[in-house]
């Protein structure tokens, strides 16, 4: 009888010890997961502009709010490779983020081109307001979910302009010109309506193509022209203001899904905070870089009547291209509604 009681007590002791050990192991594993450092490599094609500024602010916020559990690394000026390679890297988890205009992701989902629709955004202030629209954010952030991309931020960059080797002072000067555009049907169709020949090209190839005379110019952001010293090859910028340029931050869903829930919340929250801070910064930067360009080249505006004529010519481009695909048309309608709500 005593032996049986001893055996029972011994088993109970072992069971208790096992539970204690299991609990200690679980707590230790949880602490280990909490203490793990996650590297977040962010790539962008530009440098010293709003996209680069967003990266710096975002990384500073995330490192602080995560207590150092996320370590950010920023690679501007295509240091991680050409734009298509950076996007692929994000999809497969080789890098953690790409920052740039959504039109570069049309190969991932053609709806990313919807923000290229001309004539919907009136000015910088309107562009900033529309980026805060919840319905537009929800759509744009979710377009890449099935393709390994998690959208986290959107902000207004600036209106488009044409940088060219020869001055574009009138609408007729655009006709026959070979101009670089993003790989978006809406941008290409817009230039065709103006009589130009659109050529899709990644950013790293644009300046050499202008220098070599392979193209006459490009539809670009003035701040990119100025910070990358395009004035050494093409001294004329014409502010057409269409289409408006937006930037987005795209993270690797493969990487994001491995993060603990609290870090996911920090990233999503800080991404939006950084975008809100960068919006006014981008507006000021646009004005500053316009003055920088004037020191090296010329900034041209079309005559008011011709600017109005151009807007009229481009007005239906978005709706026409959107009709080619039901899901693109649905996305276009979301953008139109957001633009109207924030006008």
Feature locations, PLM:
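Short, low-complexity disordered leader/linker segments with a strong preference
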Residues: 1-39, 342-343
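N-terminal secretory/targeting leader peptides
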Residues: 31-127, 135-343
